[in-house]
Curated annotation (Swiss-Prot):
Keyword Nuclease applies: no
Family the entry assigns: Belongs to the glycosyl hydrolase 13 family.
Name this polypeptide is given: Oligo-1,6-glucosidase IMA5
GO biological process, one term: disaccharide catabolic process
Active site per database record: D210, E272
Lineage top rank: taxon: Eukaryota
One Pfam assignment: Alpha-amylase
Keyword match Hydrolase: yes
Length: 581
C-alpha cells in the first residue's frame, strides 16, 4: 500500500496551533483564555483551516507554561472552567473545526496528587510511579551526589534531591516536572484514563503527544558518555529517547484510545518524536503498527544549532536546511506511514526571521514564499498562531524579560559554570536573540490598538508584546488588505485542497540541483501528474533551469502577483509551483 491509496481526513487537514496564554484575553487579566479562543473561532474559520491544536490548558503551577500538569481533568482557573473548554469544543465543531489537545504524559507537575503521594514515603503505593533513587554518594561538603550524570534539557542535573525521604527523583525537563515510570502498569492505566479517556469522553478529536519518544528509559539508568568534560552533567538522550519498550507503550495507548471512541470516529494522533532514524519513524507512524498517525521531526528546525548546546549557533547552508526538511517526509515513501510539515510552533522562533528575511523590504514576500513551500510538501500541514500574519521575531530583549524556563535555565547554568562575562555567555545571547522560545509566545496581535494590540483591553500581558503590531502586522490590518500575508495563506490552503492529489499525497520526491545555495527545487509525482517547485532563498534575482526541457510547464501557484511563469528568472524570495506535461 502506498500513501496515495489511503486517503484520510487527518492527512488532508491543515491544523492551526493555539497557545492559550497568548491568543486572546477575554477577561482583561493579561492572560489568554479558553473563552478568548472561542470568541475568535470565526477568524480561524476564515483562514480556512480544518482543526485547531490547543496547547495545555490543564491545571498547573505553570513552571513550564502548562507542560507541568497538576490535574489532567481540570482546566487551569486562569484559562477558565471545564465548561468553558466544553463550549470551545462545541463551538469549534459547529464551524466544522476539529479540536486536538496536548497530551503531556512523560511527566507531570510536582503538584499532582499522584506525585504528592509518591513523595510522601518510600512505602507509598505510588512510590514506583516515578523514578526515585538514593544518592550515588556524598561530596566533600556532604552534599548528596545525583544517581547518574544526566543533564536536564533545561540545564543542571536531571535529578532533584528530596529531603523528606532522602532520595532523588528524575526530571529530564524542569525541576518541578517529575518523569513518570512507565514500567509500572498501574501508573500507565491511570495516565490513560485521566489524560486520554477523560478528554475523548468530552469529544476531542485527537492528541498532539508531547515528547512521545521518551516514555521508555533504559534499565538501570546508566551514566551518559562524557561528551563535554567542562561540565558535570552530560546529554543522556540515548538512554531515554526511542527506548526499549516505547513502541509497546504506544500500541497499548493506541488500543486504549480506540476503546474510548464510538465506532466509526477516527481520531488523530501526532507524536513529538523529534530525533531518530527512518526505521524508528516508520514504526511510530505505520498504519499497520497501530501507534501514531504522524510525527514531528525536529531536524529542520534545529539546523544552525550546536547539537551539544542548543543555545550556541553554528553556520548552516541552504543544502543543510533542504536535507533536514526532507527528513520530515522522505521516510514515508512507498509505505503506509504519514508525517507532518511545519516551520513554527510554541518552541520555535518565527520562521520568517529564521529561514526567510524579516527586513521591512522582504518580510511580506518571503513569508508568502515560505507558505508556498509548506503547502507544496507531502504531509499534514501545521500552522502556528501569527505565522499566517508573517510575524517576525521581536527585537532586543534583556534576560529579565525572558519567560521561557529553557532560556532562563540555560542562562543560569552558563552563568554558574562559565561566568557572566564568558565567551559561552556571549554565544548564548546571540542564540537567544534568534531562537528563543519566547519569540512564538508573545500575545497575538489582533489590532494596532495600544497598549496590547487588542489582546487584552488594557491589562499588562503576562509577556511583553512583539512591537511589530505597530507596523501593520496585526489581524485587523491584514484582514482589510487582500494582498496581505493572511489572505495569501488563505489562498494557499485553498490551492492545496484543489490540488491535493499532488500537493498532499504526491510522492517520488526528487531534489533538483541540491547543492545550489540560493534555490530550493524539487519534483514529485502522482500516478498521472508531475510537479516542479522552485524557491529563491535570497534577496537577488536568480536564474533557474527546469529539470526536463522537453516538457511543458504550467505555473499554477506562486507568491508574486506579477510573476511570469514562462520566465526562468525568480524575483527575490519568489516561489513557484508548476505542473508538467
Amino acid at each position: 500500500m502506498t500513501i496515495i491509496h489511503n486517503p484520510k481526513w487527518w492527512k488532508e487537514a491543515t491544523v492551526y496551533q493555539i497557545y492559550p496564554a497568548s491568543f486572546k484575553d477575554s477577561n482583561n487579566d493579561g492572560w489568554g483564555d479558553l473563552a478568548g479562543i472561542t470568541s475568535k473561532l470565526d477568524y480561524v474559520k476564515e483562514l480556512g483551516v480544518d482543526a485547531i491544536w490547543v496547547c495545555p490548558f490543564y491545571d498547573s503551577p505553570q513552571e513550564d507554561m502548562g507542560y507541568d500538569i497538576a490535574n489532567y481533568e481540570k482546566v487551569w482557573p486562569r484559562y477558565g472552567t471545564n465548561e468553558d473548554c466544553f463550549q470551545m469544543i462545541e463551538e469549534a465543531h459547529k464551524r466544522g473545526i476539529k479540536v486536538i489537545v496536548d497530551l503531556v504524559i512523560n511527566h507531570c507537575s510536582e503538584e499532582h496528587e499522584w506525585f504528592k503521594e509518591s513523595r510522601s514515603s518510600k512505602a507509598n503505593p505510588k512510590r514506583d510511579w516515578f523514578f526515585w533513587r538514593p544518592p550515588k554518594g556524598y561530596d566533600e561538603k556532604g552534599n548528596p551526589i545525583p544517581p547518574n550524570n544526566w543533564r536536564s534539557f533545561f540545564g543542571g542535573s536531571a535529578w532533584r534531591y528530596d529531603e523528606k525521604t532522602g532520595e532523588f527523583f528524575l526530571h529530564v525537563f524542569a525541576l518541578g516536572q517529575p518523569d513518570f515510570n512507565w514500567e509500572n502498569e498501574e501508573c500507565r492505566k491511570a495516565i490513560y484514563d485521566s489524560s486520554v479517556g477523560y478528554w475523548l469522553r468530552h469529544n476531542v478529536d485527537g492528541f498532539r503527544i508531547d515528547v512521545g519518544s521518551m516514555y521508555s528509559k533504559v534499565e538501570g539508568l546508566p551514566d551518559a558518555p562524557i561528551t563535554d568534560p567542562t561540565v558535570p552533567y552530560q546529554k543522556g538522550t540515548e538512554f531515554f529517547i526511542n527506548g526499549p519498550r516505547i513502541h509497546e507503550y504506544h500500541k497499548e495507548m493506541h488500543n486504549y484510545m480506540l476503546s474510548q471512541v464510538p465506532e466509526g470516529k477516527e481520531i488523530m494522533t501526532v507524536g513529538e518524536v523529534g530525533i531518530g532514524n527512518e526505521d524508528d519513524f516508520r514504526v511510530y507512524t505505520s498504519a499497520k503498527e497501530g501507534e501514531l498517525n504522524m510525527m514531528f521531526n525536529f531536524k529542520h528546525t534545529s539546523v544552525g544549532e550546536n547539537p551539544k548546546c542548543k543555545y550556541e549557533l553554528i553556520p548552516f547552508t541552504l543544502k543543510d536546511f533542504k536535507l533536514a526538511l526532507a527528513e520530515s517526509f522522505l521516510f514515508i515513501e512507498n509505505t503506509d506511514c504519514w508525517s507532518t510539515i511545519y516551520l513554527e510552533n510554541h518552541d520555535q522562533p518565527r520562521s520568517v526571521s529564521r529561514f526567510g528575511s524579516d527586513s521591512p523590504k522582504w518580510r511580506e514576500i518571503s513569508s508568502k514564499m515560505l507558505a508556498t513551500l509548506i503547502i507544496s510538501l507531502t504531509g499534514t500541514v501545521f500552522i502556528y498562531q501569527g505565522q499566517e500574519l508573517g510575524m517576525p521575531n521581536f527585537k532586543n530583549r534583556k534576560i529579565e524579560q525572558i519567560k521561557c524556563v529553557e532560556g532562563t535555565g540555560t542562562y543560569a547554568a552558563i552563568k554558574r559554570d562559565y561566568g557572566e562575562d564568558s565567551e559561552k555567555m556571549k554565544k548564548f545571547f546571540e542564540a537567544l536573540a534568534l531562537i528563543s522560545r519566547d519569540h512564538g509566545r508573545t500575545p497575538f496581535p489582533w489590532s494596532a490598538d495600544e497598549p496590547s494590540a487588542g489582546f487584552s483591553k488594557d491589562a499588562k500581558p503576562w509577556i511583553d508584546m512583539n512591537e511589530s503590531f505597530r507596523d501593520g502586522i496585526n489581524a485587523e490590518a491584514e484582514l482589510k488588505d487582500k494582498n496581505s500575508v493572511f489572505f495569501f495563506w488563505k489562498k494557499a490552503l485553498q490551492v492545496r485542497k484543489e490540488h491535493k492529489d499532488i500537493l498532499v499525497y504526491g510522492h517520488n520526491f526528487q531534489f533538483i540541483d541540491l547543492d545550489n545555495d540560493k534555490l530550493f527545487m524539487f519534483t514529485k509525482d502522482t500516478d498521472n501528474k508531475k510537479m516542479f517547485a522552485v524557491f529563491n532563498f535570497s534577496s537577488d534575482n536568480t536564474d533557474f533551469s527546469v529539470p526536463d526541457n522537453e516538457a511543458s510547464y504550467t505555473m499554477f501557484f506562486g507568491n508574486y502577483a506579477n510573476s511570469n511563469g514562462d520566465s526562468r528568472t525568480l524575483q527575490p524570495w519568489e516561489g513557484r509551483l508548476y505542473l508538467l506535461k
